[in-house]
Regions:
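Short hydrophobic alpha-helices and adjacent helix-cap/hinge residues
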Residues: 1-332
Length: 332
């Protein structure tokens, strides 16, 4: 007759077997990949520069990271539903390209980290406590410096020495209002009067340009964030029609037919946003990640447009450009 095993031997054996099975199951199950909620003002997908930035850091969409993309299609009234949807999905990190959306997220969640790629005034709008120590769940990049408006006015003055009245065609919201306010100081120093004009909807643009010409503006500063190429082209065409030298701050403005553009290199901003995502995924807190100012500015000139409005760009200005679209049939 065999001696009976103590009961504890069987219990231990079962426990060991259960542990081994659990380990095998866990090994077979794919590790949870982080979800990035991405809300854009417009567009059909995340910025390619952002995707490249992630790849540089070892993240491949669908393999070790997932991006849940939503677009407002240029309609700010859609932010509330899209913000609620992404928060409801419990994404790990939120990325957005504008201040209004970031503020909407901040109202709904204080726990999901938010990375903003292009904030004009993160402190003034209440997104963060300070540039050095944001202090909440928002961090990221600002796309503007306080001197941007003044720099654009200086460029306009160089190509139009008799510049006296400049219209600022802009969007709504506190960031745009701050831009106008910060530009007033250098405008006074240059003896330029500013005329602030809210762009409104696409159907209002013709009337806005009539108002600008009625105000006798002889220069135009275009501050329209989030416009796609078709809408930018519409604005550029109207500026050409009214023979207004127009400098924009948006990427794609010169390609759309605008005379000149000066502003942060948006592609660099998006690649840097990927760095913020990486840091957050590795355990850093948004409250401790400083807001980053633009690292690179782009100055572009369209000589075709200059010719259309009868303007000659001085060589001293051309030499400083990072990109020049030459006249058609130019041999240079």
């Amino acid at each position: 007759m065999r001696p009976r095993r103590p009961k504890w031997v069987g219990i231990v054996a079962l426990a060991v077997a259960f542990t081994l099975c659990s380990a095998m199951v866990e090994a077979q199950q794919p590790a949870k990949i982080p979800w990035i909620g991405y809300l854009a003002r417009s567009g059909s997908g995340p910025s390619p520069a952002f995707i490249l930035g992630l790849r540089d850091l070892g993240y491949v969409e669908g393999k070790n990271i997932a991006i849940v993309f939503r677009t407002a299609e240029g309609k700010t009234e859609r932010y509330a539903e899209l913000v609620a949807e992404l928060v409801r999905l419990k994404v790990d990190i939120i990325v957005t390209d504008n201040t209004i959306a970031a503020l909407a997220f901040k109202k709904v969640t204080s726990t999901i980290p938010i990375v903003i790629t292009n904030s004009t005034d993160p402190v003034g709008t209440g997104l963060v406590a300070s540039f050095a120590r944001p202090g909440g769940n928002v961090t990221g990049l600002t796309n503007i410096s306080g001197e941007l408006g003044g720099k654009i006015l200086e460029l306009l003055k160089e190509i139009v020495p008799k510049l006296t009245r400049v219209a600022i065609l802009r969007g709504t919201g506190p960031a745009n209002e701050l831009f106008v306010k910060e530009t007033e100081v250098p405008a006074r120093a240059l003896k330029i009067q500013l005329i602030s004009v809210v762009a409104g909807g696409p159907e209002e643009l013709e009337n806005k340009f009539r108002a600008i010409t009625k105000e006798r503006a002889n220069g135009l500063l275009v501050r329209l964030v989030g416009y796609d190429s078709a809408r930018l082209k519409r604005v550029a065409d109207l500026a050409i029609k009214n023979r207004l030298p127009a400098v924009g701050t948006a990427n794609g403005w010169v390609e759309a037919g605008g005379l000149m553009s000066y502003g942060a290199d948006i592609n660099v901003q998006y690649r840097r946003a990927a760095v913020y995502v990486d840091k957050l995924l590795k355990g850093r807190k948004p409250a401790d990640l400083p807001i980053e100012a633009p690292m690179k500015f782009e100055f572009e000139i369209n000589l075709q447009t200059a010719k259309q409005i009868g303007l000659t760009i001085p060589q001293t200005v051309l030499f400083r450009a990072t990109k020049v679209i030459k006249e058609k049939n130019s041999k240079e």
